[in-house]
Design a protein with these regions (language model features):
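Ribonuclease/tRNase effector modules and their secretory precursors
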Residues: 1-186
Length: 186
């Protein structure tokens, strides 16, 4: 693994090209929600956390020196991850995309998963980068709301678990999630 000690940079061991990973630092942002239709909207802080799947992919034919992470799956198998320059390049704008997510159309999936489609190709409506995120709420943690950016993928079709094909604004999905968790006021 060719990370520096703080994992702020990854160095390609074959080309010695350095890739900054600062775009994947956790941060806190704020979104406006309205869980109660009769209530007033209010802002909630949300911690944003990035998985290394935002800049890596499953190993195929790459040399062992390209492996950046080994992950054990629930089914007992092991997945080796390698750096993905295409994902890394797309994700350089990811913090800004997440900051401005509130009024953007997103799709809900299973188990509190939310998808955002970016950079549509213009050829087919479903082509584009899909950002896969999961909402979490932990009342005793500060901030209580978390948005875990699980991965990004270029796809020609939508993920199979998308339920609302027309999509909703992110803040509406976050409001529904807050209501489900019993959060009706700041």
């Amino acid at each position: 693994m060719a990370f520096n000690n703080e994992k702020t940079t990854w160095m390609d061991p074959d080309t010695n090209t350095a890739y900054a990973l600062s775009a994947f630092n956790s941060f806190v942002t704020t979104y406006e929600i309205k869980p109660d239709k009769e209530g007033e909207p209010f802002s909630v802080p949300v911690r944003v956390i990035f998985s290394n799947h935002c800049y890596s992919r499953e190993r195929k034919e790459e040399q062992a020196n390209q492996i950046i992470d080994t992950q054990h799956r629930r089914d007992g198998t092991t997945e080796e991850r390698v750096f993905c320059q295409k994902r890394w390049k797309f994700c350089q704008d990811l913090p800004m995309i997440i900051e401005n997510l509130g009024l953007q159309k997103c799709f809900s999936g299973d188990r509190d998963i939310i998808y955002r489609q970016e950079q549509k190709s213009g050829v087919a409506a479903q082509d584009g980068w899909y950002i896969c995120m999961r909402l979490d709420y932990r009342e005793k943690k500060g901030p209580a709301f978390e948005l875990w950016v699980r991965s990004v993928h270029w796809r020609r079709n939508r993920p199979v678990d998308i339920r609302n094909h027309g999509g909703q604004k992110f803040r509406q999905l976050l409001s529904q999630f807050a209501k489900k968790k019993g959060v009706f006021e700041p």
